Amino acid sequence: MAEKRNIFLVGPMGAGKSTIGRQLAQQLNMEFYDSDHEIEKRTGADVGWVFDVEGEEGFRDREEKVINELTEKQGIVLATGGGSVKSRETRNRLSARGVVVYLETTIEKQLARTQRDKKRPLLQVETPPREVLEALAGERNPLYEEIADVTIRTDDQSAKVVANQIIHMLESN
């Protein structure tokens, strides 16, 4: 890959966007960004706190601004928040400014990967996690599919294997 295109990872929580993104950036010698981490850096608070204080709408506004700013960069790998695709503006930006890779996974894998993680505000509710994840999948999966240039299933694969698949698919296009 001569020219370094931006690579934007989308998908549900627990799909491996951050882990795979770091691996991919390392293998391609590109800068890695995580939109949730960038929000935490700017606010000085974790995502859960921002959600609690500002609500989901306030969080999504911050997320949209961060993603807009990061997509202006060149040659980066960006792991987006699972709900970032709810914003049409964000979907349009991601599509226009890089290659969008949808990391797909099952509800079972999401449950296994997120069960002990207390930094998932949408799972810190009374509703059973499976019901929350199923509702989010129904709402968001069509949005991931809408903007995906490449879709890769991450269920039982290591970050390195998935990163290699992404690189191979990008080189083929």
UniProtKB/Swiss-Prot annotation:
GO biological process: amino acid biosynthetic process; aromatic amino acid family biosynthetic process; chorismate biosynthetic process
Cofactor note: Binds 1 Mg(2+) ion per subunit.
Binding, substrate: 36, 60, 82, 140
Catalytic activity annotation: shikimate + ATP = 3-phosphoshikimate + ADP + H(+)
Cofactor dependence: Mg(2+)
Domain of life (superkingdom): Bacteria
Associated pathway: Metabolic intermediate biosynthesis; chorismate biosynthesis; chorismate from D-erythrose 4-phosphate and phosphoenolpyruvate: step 5/7
PROSITE patterns reported in the protein's UniProt record: SHIKIMATE_KINASE (PS01128)
A Gene Ontology cellular-component term: cytosol
Transmembrane residue ranges: none
Keyword presence, Cytoplasm: yes
Documented EC number(s): 2.7.1.71
Localization terms from the record: Cytoplasm
Enzyme category, top tier: transferase
Main location: cytoplasm
Keyword field contains ATP-binding: yes
Annotated keywords: Amino-acid biosynthesis, Aromatic amino acid biosynthesis, ATP-binding, Cytoplasm, Kinase, Magnesium, Metal-binding, Nucleotide-binding, Transferase
Molecular function (Gene Ontology), one example: magnesium ion binding
Residues bound to ATP: 14-19, 120, 157
Family, per entry: Belongs to the shikimate kinase family.
NCBIfam families in alphabetical order: PRK05057.1
Function in brief: Catalyzes the specific phosphorylation of the 3-hydroxyl group of shikimic acid using ATP as a cosubstrate.
Protein name as annotated: Shikimate kinase 1
Organism: Enterobacter sp. (strain 638)
